[in-house]
């Protein structure tokens, strides 16, 4: 069937900011889809609120709108652009929910916009739990015993019939938001009321728990002619009960018999045919390990996290083909881009094993609730490819960057066996490593199986890994055993530990005896057809399939899994760097291990190596490819941390030299440079022990800010006010980075300013200066950034420009540099310098039209900025005002305090742009999920030091008609100024504030941190309650002030004459 000619313009809705449950996989899917539609000749209009993505680059669509993903804003774009059609299935749950709202409000009908791809009725049938269950009953496909509830009372009625445990699944949410497993009445009450709150339809499915069944997924495609294929089937190692995004996944499935595989395949195809899916779809099934009984769990009628994984696992570009199916093309007329000869109707076959392991944020949130269930907690994931299951698992483990490189914990031998078993009996993010530890201690596989329900097949594989460890110990230095361990994915580091050698000695031993990996191609067809994809993985076999060309090569290190502090912004820079390398005539090679991102799409680079980002794995590739050099400044801290290790092997680091990278991080050298170029910084010292830190603080004066050197995202950074807090910190944090000392700095409260610049060794260009709304002390990734600065004087701007140029030249930067300044006591001070690409590069690149990562890469290759047409200094300002607002995923993480501070907590960001600061802020806040209302009720409870400042704020909110609730201390302060406030009780008292929040009486909460155990606990409870009830909670008065400005701009003030 030819494609549709009756439509010309297509609107694509993106997925918005990165949150837990909806990460970079939609940047990848959306980018592929937009390019595919343009390739077919359609005019593409994209709306997405996330500036950090490749998808929102001007080249990807004909028109790009970076606007909040709300009904009203998208409706305006539809009225303005008059698209013929809307494609909703590539923007995750956000895109789907938006399409449903636009349909129900009549906007699509009024503007004659058709929906492409899967029909709305089918989407609703898959997403609405009641309609889905009805269809399954009609098809005779078993679903777990379940009931749909709209109230907590109904949930208790169902519990009386079936008993515990129960699984709660809210409708129309993603990442299992609001859901969970209930074992008793208290949990049932809490989880169901939460779930009803988060479900746009106020509807939850309660089902009898089938925890312990195998969880199997099929990624399927179907077109309008009813051609349907399975692209990939996957098996979760964790049984049903853990969200698939938090499960360790293997592809293809390993423990299904052919009968089981075909049975579940037939069911998956039968269901998507009945639903009338057109495009990609993910089917999740539960299989009883002891019989042929199965249940269907759910169907995602859209491109999902699993489809990104399936695309990278097979090389089959699901999103690209789904977009083409949506405009009428069919599978039997589209070529598979990997082979270029077979059609898209051929089901991929794999001659390798894929392992995916989720990346959790608990290294950032040590107090977070680690137990895993049906609500997702991982921020990202890694994938690894091997010839055996053991090899792919161990490669995935060392890709995670937890400081773990094997099946065990660094301090594993220090735990006693009872504690280890206790940890295994609970499902959490470290269970896999504790299983390895238990097997080492001789625990039987039967006992582990009874505690975890993990299939014996996988437990035997774990046992095999431990057996090889013992063999290495018994045959130290034996080459046969070394080779054997390499076949099963062991790292040099692990072998060195067992051989009683250093990692370097094992590496040399391998080199001398020619024990090196070869690289195999990912070709979708197990080498049945000729294939030309430049997509490789390493394994220890004989035949190398990676053909080395004569062209000069540059190797770019990617940034690994998405985590807090290192998000999709670094992938954005990586992709742009690769494009610049290709334009300059070099061969561009990427090494990365994140299946969700654009950089690991095989069509981006000349060669993609899907490998762990470790010294050993990267050196193996360098030894084969012999590149001109390696680029580390676009891959975040992951890549920067490898620079030293690679340089020791004689590898050339391109761009800013290693010596200068270290100068920016080394305290004493950096201070010497600042003195030389005459740039001030807050007074500070370094400490290697608690005693030294206390002496430093006494000299500098409290408050001080303390942090380990060489970290990203403000990990383990804190502001402390006295000796006791400092001692506490030093005993906890010196762990954070033992080889590197702790920095103790005077904490200056003032305006924080962020600057990104590019330097070629001679000229420094500054695309933009950004001012933070929150005072210094809130991590830059969690602050609202404003461009251009709104409150700085000409003198301050000139000083910032001058200092930036001095710093870039003083550090001999070649490429990008990011600098944070504070303006305090009438002076500009430098807070920190990062000699690499930063979180704000995509944001500034979009605003100014200066392709920063590409210019930096060209400078690294040796081109001059003046030859590219740029003059030194700050570049001309773009028109309008732009804000970057952070987005948090606190509703997915229990027990995490949401107070903003020097440690980063946000998972993503949105951009707001308009003609005034207030309008841009309105969009930024709306896009980040803060509903800005022109009237309502605000609850204020602030620390003593903030009481004076909060008076002015209360006055302004009162004048625009906001009602004020306050705790007694704050209310008394307001009464002094005749500001009416209703007093609410402290926690546990009469008319207590938590009840008021839970009852929906409050629209905004302003709560600032008070030190001291009891009040800290209260404050923590207040903040968690607001998050769990979906109410904006502002922990910085600067953010509250900005919000008040927006409210004032939307309304009229009422003052008596």
Swiss-Prot record:
Domain ATP-grasp: 133-327, 671-861
Record: residues binding Mg(2+) 2: 298, 300
Residues the entry annotates as binding Mn(2+) 2: 298, 300
Cofactor note: Binds 4 Mg(2+) or Mn(2+) ions per subunit.
SUPFAM superfamilies per UniProt: Carbamoyl phosphate synthetase, large subunit connection domain, Glutathione synthetase ATP-binding domain-like, Methylglyoxal synthase-like, PreATP-grasp domain
Reactions the enzyme catalyzes: hydrogencarbonate + L-glutamine + 2 ATP + H2O = carbamoyl phosphate + L-glutamate + 2 ADP + phosphate + 2 H(+)
Region ranges (Carboxyphosphate synthetic domain): 1-401
Ranges where the MGS-like domain occurs: 930-1057
Residue numbers spanned by region Allosteric domain: 930-1057
Record-level GO cellular component terms: cytoplasm
Record-listed ATP 2 binding positions: 707, 746, 748, 752, 777-780, 820, 832
Keywords on record: Amino-acid biosynthesis, Arginine biosynthesis, ATP-binding, Ligase, Magnesium, Manganese, Metal-binding, Nucleotide-binding, Pyrimidine biosynthesis, Repeat
Residues binding Mg(2+) 3, per UniProt: 820, 832
Recorded domain comment: The large subunit is composed of 2 ATP-grasp domains that are involved in binding the 2 ATP molecules needed for carbamoyl phosphate synthesis. The N-terminal ATP-grasp domain (referred to as the carboxyphosphate synthetic component) catalyzes the ATP-dependent phosphorylation of hydrogencarbonate to carboxyphosphate and the subsequent nucleophilic attack by ammonia to form a carbamate intermediate.
Function: Large subunit of the glutamine-dependent carbamoyl phosphate synthetase (CPSase). CPSase catalyzes the formation of carbamoyl phosphate from the ammonia moiety of glutamine, carbonate, and phosphate donated by ATP, constituting the first step of 2 biosynthetic pathways, one leading to arginine and/or urea and the other to pyrimidine nucleotides.
Protein name, UniProt field: Carbamoyl phosphate synthase large chain
Species whose genome carries this gene: Staphylococcus aureus (strain bovine RF122 / ET3-1)
